[in-house]
């Protein structure tokens, strides 16, 4: 159930160039699942007006804390980056349908593919898959080394490959270069990132079960404004879906790419 709460800042730190890790404390954490997101009001003033959708990177229900990782590049997220321990942040959430962690049986293997700021939600997903006895393989793509993050955290959960467009870290090129050269064996894949990457994955693994998390610009975050609609394929009855309320995670092949 979506609720609004003023959550307390536990910590905030910069972990890469313009990339921030923000941990908040509050009751909303108890309802969160991997792949969902929250809509954050970055300031108590009227400007910026719209909330910012940010994915959930880590969930700690024992301590009522969750972590977001975001890029501070626009006016709103730059304001959010000024928050310090003890301050409050107005959060609406959790929103959307997350990743189905039960899609992989115990003893199976999941391939997790992320690109840029689509990487964070895969961290909590990998944690929960590991807890169910599932092996995880991570292929994570970034533009350059200076914007890479969470290498130790992902490596602690499973086999991890980093890819950068300029070759400054890991394999040079795109995530598909690693998938071609390594040809990992797996049962189900999960992915979050830019549309070209998601489209490439669908073409790469036409026979595999997969789940894609979409990154779309959003206005309201609750399905009222229709700012984030995507056209569907003929696999489902709807002509269009809303990424915020119907997604952001969809089974492979249901959204037209």
Curated annotation (Swiss-Prot):
Pfam entry (one): DHODB_Fe-S_bind
PROSITE patterns: FAD_FR
Domain of life per record: Bacteria
Protein name per UniProt: Dihydroorotate dehydrogenase B (NAD(+)), electron transfer subunit
InterPro entries: Cbr1-like_FAD-bd_dom, Cyt_c3_hydrogenase_gsu, Dihydroorotate_DH_ele_sf, Dihydroorotate_DH_Fe-S-bd, Dihydroorotate_DHASE_ETsu, FAD-bd_FR_type, FNR_nucleotide-bd, OxRdtase_FAD/NAD-bd
NCBIfam families: PRK00054.1-2, PRK00054.1-4
Subunit structure, as described in the record: Heterotetramer of 2 PyrK and 2 PyrD type B subunits.
Pathway annotation from the record: Pyrimidine metabolism; UMP biosynthesis via de novo pathway; orotate from (S)-dihydroorotate (NAD(+) route): step 1/1
GO MF annotations in UniProt: 2 iron, 2 sulfur cluster binding; electron transfer activity; flavin adenine dinucleotide binding; metal ion binding; oxidoreductase activity
Gene Ontology annotations of biological process type: 'de novo' UMP biosynthetic process
Cofactor note: Binds 1 [2Fe-2S] cluster per subunit. Binds 1 FAD per subunit.
Record bears the keyword Transport: yes
Cofactor(s) named in the record: [2Fe-2S] cluster; FAD
Annotated function: Responsible for channeling the electrons from the oxidation of dihydroorotate from the FMN redox center in the PyrD type B subunit to the ultimate electron acceptor NAD(+).
Coiled-coil residues: none
Binding locations of [2Fe-2S] cluster: 220, 225, 228, 244
The entry's keywords: 2Fe-2S, Electron transport, FAD, Flavoprotein, Iron, Iron-sulfur, Metal-binding, Pyrimidine biosynthesis, Transport
FAD-binding FR-type domain residues: 2-101
